[in-house]
Amino acid sequence: MKVLVYFQPNRKYDNYEGARMRKTIKGALEVVGATHTSNIYDDYDIAHFMSPEDESKMSIALERGVPVIVSALFGEDDPSARFLSHKSKDGKRTTTLRNRALKMLNKATLVLVPTESAKKFLIESGVETPIETCIPGINLARFNFSREDEKELFYRYFREDKNKKIVLAVGEYDNNLEGIHAFINVATKRDDTVFYYVGSETTNLNNGRAKTIIKDAPKNVHFKNILPDDIYRSLLLNADVFMLPGYNLAGIISVEEAMAAKCQLIVRKSSVFPELVKNEKTAYIAQFSETLTSLCLDYLDGEIKPTIQEANEQVSEHSLQKFGDQLVNIYNSLIKNK
């Protein structure tokens, strides 16, 4: 069996969640001995896509008569892998499936999503294609704490004081940076901690409220665009806290990596699937910014217990071997029944 694993974003997004998902799928297939290609014009038995932007490429695979799988809702912080759109008006936030995404998903043979709540959302949004849950695996070896050289990369790259704690947040740079003050307000009270916000620049930050927020942030807060993969991983390995201050659904890939890197998760309720993390067991979850800020401060002060070990044990169950076996079983079933 040969699998087309296709995701080819704009180069500046080729270190982000979609690219990391592509790497995970390829790695899982290699672990279980399955062959893969990224050439749409190659010979293959089944095709696996990850982005609504690739609908035209998916049509090429469909014309060849091969089954087509689409993985959805795993990398929502990545503009190149995003299936959802979000709007905020008069204090009310709505999340909908993008029209292009709906069209693509309804052309596929099968849709894979990480959780049952994701499946329910797609069905309610008009997806008629069969949907199965399959949480992405993770290469646990990439988060090996015995590799001091991996951890050292962050300090060589950013020249930070090793005695300071680190809080990492991920999201996107929209016009308002909604929810960001839950992150910034922690920084105003912690001179002994450095804060990094990493995201994709989807709007022009030279104008609007986001520019003002970034300009007025404390000096211990650093806003970064997408980082090289090894630098980002090193940042994760050194971070004490992984925070999701935004309101929009975050990428499950980023959450799994933070769990593997043994960061303490402090996340907004709307940013994660309810099945992925459990409050006070594998993460601290809050709805309001004030609570997120308070939780982060309490954790840094040692006033609430870590949930790191439980989270790491949970994500350790999602190995590349297990993910690869699941994918191959799904692929074989579709090929057999085509």
Model-derived segments and spans:
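Short hydrophobic beta-strand element within catalytic cores of glycosyltransferases
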Residues: 264-267
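Membrane-proximal helix-turn-helix segments that form the acceptor-binding/catalytic region
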Residues: 76, 91-111
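Glycosyltransferase donor-sugar binding loop
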Residues: 170, 194-210, 225
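Conserved donor-binding/catalytic core segment of Leloir-type glycosyltransferases
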Residues: 160-178, 184-187
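Aromatic "clamp/platform" in nucleotide-sugar-dependent glycosyltransferases that forms part
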Residues: 247
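Nucleotide-activated donor-binding/catalytic signature segment of Leloir-type glycosyltransferases, i.e.
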Residues: 208-230
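Conserved acidic donor-binding segment of nucleotide-sugar-dependent glycosyltransferases
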Residues: 279-290, 297-303
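A short, active-site helix/loop in glycosyltransferases that binds the activated sugar's phosphate group
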Residues: 104-130, 138-142
